[in-house]
Design a protein with these regions (language model features):
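Catalytic nucleophile-elbow at a beta strand-turn-alpha helix junction centered on a G-D-S/GDSL motif
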Residues: 16-30, 56-59
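Glycine-rich phosphate/diphosphate-binding loops that line cofactor/substrate pockets in enzymes
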Residues: 9-15
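Alpha-helical cap/lid subdomain in secreted, periplasmic
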Residues: 12, 33-49, 58-198
Length: 198
């Protein structure tokens, strides 16, 4: 399936107020600073405002609780949302009942996402884009303390995001699979290559 629904993701217009919502990957500011730089250098007569609503360590249930004051109160015309890395847990993947614990965390995440989805649907004057989160790298040889099957759990969350975007007519961009493909290619040359430092 197509990981990028470009036709449903309109470019930013002059005066657009864009809020990027997410976890530490958003909080770090890298990907949306590139978006801002692209628009600033190519469309200097169409200024936009980019606002970072990423908070490190957060999951969908945390994001749900701060939608009003951290997202909607900023009067955005455009909102992107990503989550999944923290939602899926970490050391649970080392436990004997990892599969069961993982399913519980995925369900908790998706339950919160359904609430977020309802709130976003009620805000009909803004463009919404869901971002399938970046991967957890299980194939790097950088270290041996890997959380096996963590990216599979992230992919289940991304699948729900993709379906919601399609159902609601929202944009969807998948960071996960393109980054996995690049990692696998680079690891053929250097087994310790990774984008993921968790």
């Amino acid at each position: 399936s197509n990981s990028l629904y470009a036709q449903s993701i309109p470019p930013f217009k002059k005066g657009e107020r864009v809020v990027f919502v997410g976890n530490s990957i958003t909080h770090g500011g890298h990907y949306h600073s590139f978006v801002w730089l692209y628009y600033m250098t190519r469309f200097p007569n169409k200024p936009i405002t980019i606002m970072n609503a990423g908070i490190g360590g957060e999951s969908a249930w945390d994001i749900k609780d701060r939608l009003d004051y951290d997202v909607f109160d900023r009067k955005p015309t455009y909102v992107t949302l990503t989550f999944g890395m923290n939602d899926t847990g970490y050391d649970i993947f080392w436990k004997e009942n990892a599969k069961e614990l993982s399913e519980q965390r995925i369900e908790k995440s998706l339950e919160s996402f359904r609430e977020i989805e309802k709130r976003l649907l009620a805000e009909n004057k803004m463009t919404k884009v869901l971002i399938g989160g970046s991967p957890y790298d299980e194939t790097t040889k950088l270290n041996s303390l890997l959380f096996l099957h963590k990216n599979d759990a992230i992919l289940k969350i991304i699948d729900a995001q993709r379906k919601a975007a399609k159902k609601n007519g929202w944009g969807f961009v998948d960071f996960n699979q393109p980054m996995v493909q690049i990692s696998l290619e680079e690891q053929k040359k250097d087994s310790t290559f990774t984008f993921c430092r968790v």
